């Protein structure tokens, strides 16, 4: 992977891999992070770690050279969501997300909150349908559309509001690239190398399949974090992706 210049002290990688840091122990998380190279991936910090260890933990990861996807899925009244997104930008994260189901006014307010940050603003992504959800789960909420159709409706709203892209399942990526264009970024969890267990993600795909489907950033968790040699696992994934490109 080629290390390129950044507008900040954070390293920039051209790898599409984002490793999910799902730890409840700060030292264990940092011990893992110190085994891998920021040129090989970005890192995702979610609700558990951010609640436990706060912004300072994000700064520690940034000081090690990593770009951070702050995966807090903001979903609130427009003013509150906008202030939260601006706070994430102040923290210097690379990507932040909101729930598309928060609606157009909320997403527009979040986007407008990033205007003062200019080129230093993080990517603003909306969550469509959680990858753990199936049609029966949506039906329980009164949604009669299929997960794919509902995700597409929310993605269309997201693009209309001017956000950078959406979180979606890999199965939706081909259709989304056709409908929303190449510049609309697709971020996909549930990506697992061949031979990995599915875990709690229902709709999964391998990194190579995700790349072919049009996924821009693929979130990979336990197959890397629980690997005996995570650095080598990352290098193998990236090498395979380069061969598939």
Swiss-Prot record:
EC number, as in UniProt: 4.1.1.23
Keywords: Decarboxylase, Lyase, Pyrimidine biosynthesis
Zinc recorded as keyword: no
A cellular component term, taken from the record's GO annotations: cytosol
GO MF annotation terms: orotidine-5'-phosphate decarboxylase activity
Ranges annotated as spanning the membrane: none
Top-level taxonomic group: Bacteria
Residues binding substrate, per UniProt: 22, 44, 71-80, 131, 192, 201, 221-222
Active site: 73
Gene3D superfamilies, per the entry: Aldolase class I (3.20.20.70)
GO biological process annotation, one example: 'de novo' pyrimidine nucleobase biosynthetic process
Catalytic activity: orotidine 5'-phosphate + H(+) = UMP + CO2
Keyword Phosphoprotein appears in the UniProt entry: no
Pathway info: Pyrimidine metabolism; UMP biosynthesis via de novo pathway; UMP from orotate: step 2/2
Function: Catalyzes the decarboxylation of orotidine 5'-monophosphate (OMP) to uridine 5'-monophosphate (UMP).
Subunit structure: Homodimer.
Assigned protein family: Belongs to the OMP decarboxylase family. Type 1 subfamily.
Protein name: Orotidine 5'-phosphate decarboxylase
Organism: Escherichia coli O157:H7
Gene for this chain: pyrF
């Amino acid at each position: 992977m080629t290390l390129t210049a950044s507008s900040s002290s954070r390293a920039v990688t051209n790898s599409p891999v984002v490793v999910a840091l799902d730890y409840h122990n700060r030292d264990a998380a940092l011990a893992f992070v110190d085994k891998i190279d920021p040129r090989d991936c970005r890192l995702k910090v979610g609700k558990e770690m951010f609640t436990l260890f706060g912004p300072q933990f994000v700064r520690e990861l940034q000081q090690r050279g990593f770009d951070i996807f702050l995966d807090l899925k903001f979903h609130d009244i427009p003013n509150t969501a906008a202030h939260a997104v601006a706070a994430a930008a102040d923290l210097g994260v690379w990507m932040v997300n909101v729930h598309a189901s928060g609606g157009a006014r909320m997403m527009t307010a979040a986007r407008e909150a990033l205007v003062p940050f200019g080129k230093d603003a993080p990517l603003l992504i909306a969550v469509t349908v959680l990858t753990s959800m199936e049609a029966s789960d949506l039906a329980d909420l009164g949604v009669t559309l299929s997960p794919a159709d509902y995700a597409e409706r929310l993605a269309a709203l997201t693009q209309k509001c001017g956000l950078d892209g959406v979180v979606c399942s890999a199965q939706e990526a081909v259709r989304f690239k056709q409908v929303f264009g190449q510049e609309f970024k697709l971020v996909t969890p549930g990506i697992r190398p061949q031979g990995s267990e599915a875990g709690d993600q229902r709709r999964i795909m391998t990194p190579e399949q995700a790349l072919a489907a049009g996924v821009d950033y693929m979130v990979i968790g336990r197959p890397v974090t629980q690997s005996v040699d995570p650095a080598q696992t990352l290098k193998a994934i990236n090498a395979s992706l380069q061969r598939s490109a």
